Amino acid sequence: MITIHLRYEIDPAKVADFEHYGKLWIELVNRAGGTHHGYFLPSEGDSDEGFALFSFESFAAYEEYRKWVFTDPDCLAASKFAADTQCIRRWERRFLSPVFS
């Protein structure tokens, strides 16, 4: 299993837009065979930082998802929403191996 950790720098005035974006991607990742662990919005502390975690069975499955993202109309629409609203300033991606016990 591989877990992807995304750290977003977001516009603090557009947290509601970022939340909407996150809800779109939760459904899309799950539809693509991944397991989305949620988006995490700012509460206390930094107001311009958000996170997401999702997993795929393997890195190969994640690579298939990445190919799908660039062709699926709903994925393209979700990306366009973020670009149009400018709720995301930048993002970073990390690949992690989870330990459960």
Residue map of PLM features:
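Short, structured motif recognition centered on aromatic/hydrophobic residues
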Residues: 2-7, 18, 29, 50-53
